[in-house]
Amino acid sequence: MALRRCLPQYSTTSSYLSKIWGFRMHGTKAAASVVEEHVSGAEREDEEYADVDWDNLGFSLVRTDFMFATKSCRDGNFEQGYLSRYGNIELNPAAGILNYGQGLIEGMKAYRGEDGRVLLFRPELNAMRMKIGAERMCMHSPSVHQFIEGVKQTVLANRRWVPPPGKGSLYLRPLLFGSGASLGVAAASEYTFLVFGSPVQNYFKEGTAALNLYVEEVIPRAYLGGTGGVKAISNYGPVLEVMRRAKSRGFSDVLYLDADTGKNIEEVSAANIFLVKGNTIVTPATSGTILGGITRKSIIEIALDLGYKVEERSVPVEELKEAEEVFCTGTAAGVASVGSITFKNTRTEYKVGDGIVTQQLRSILVGIQTGSIQDTKDWVLQIA
């Protein structure tokens, strides 16, 4: 995955991509010199949709056409980015990501509206969250503009993989990792920013059905002073065994407690959690061990606009018994109703279905994301 010279701007190739792939770049600049190497002689892929069973999408990887990549220069700035065919990448065995876990991920979605527009939801927040994470992990990061441009190029190059309206979304995975070699414990000398996508539908196997969570009492997800508040790749490996055990017992996912006291709920494996009690919506405060989710932030703002009282604070695990509704939020999960939570062999059930607060919040959020509800907050970025 060799990159060209280090330039602050992207190379201009919108006319080439428009001619070959049948889409307009809408101001986004792509890297034709590298793309041409990969697509010359290839069959046209200008049909509106890829050959996918859109009615049976899950949340597993579907190989799309292109990915985007760029690398950092010696001064920490990033080179011009380029699109290449989706495929494997080459890494030095001494790369920082392999030896010392220097890596961050993001999760985003591109939606196709009923009017055919292709939309991104608050991409600048993902870009800023990656920059914050990069500071914590001692990494160089792309600028907000570079981040968004890379995401836009990825979506436009894979436009036929954006599902039809109401059939799902194109999940986007921006990655930032140490690709430079280092034998001793040290920050990498070079970083790679990469974006790929995959069409998806529901994150949980339950689909839109309510989730069944299990409270993990022994193994915490994050520790004070650690990396729980950023989207570091190292946050996810340690919870895989906990998730596997819970799912083998029939649970959808795991709800973790704080490492300090073991008495307060924090978050699910890859989602934030909310409790509904009357007109009050409660969620654990993001105090360094909990990821500040973008869906979480958006739901809080929507709830406040609707007149609900929102409390961000420590939430004792015993308070789960007082909730009328519980729901999870995340880019992958969306807004997912929780039907029950099991703690110390005691199962507490919650309201689910139509007419509940969770459904109201979900409908508004999805409406804004897909363009069916007017975006009065300037949250949505139209890219096609």
From Swiss-Prot:
Keywords of the record: Aminotransferase, Branched-chain amino acid catabolism, Mitochondrion, Pyridoxal phosphate, Transferase, Transit peptide
EC number(s) per entry: 2.6.1.42
Primary localization class, coarse: mitochondrion
Cofactor(s) named in the record: pyridoxal 5'-phosphate
One CC-aspect GO term: mitochondrion
Entry function: Converts 2-oxo acids to branched-chain amino acids. Acts on leucine, isoleucine and valine.
Any further remark recorded for this protein: Branched-chain amino acids are synthesized in chloroplasts, whereas the degradation takes place in mitochondria.
Family: Belongs to the class-IV pyridoxal-phosphate-dependent aminotransferase family.
Name of the protein in question: Branched-chain-amino-acid aminotransferase 1, mitochondrial
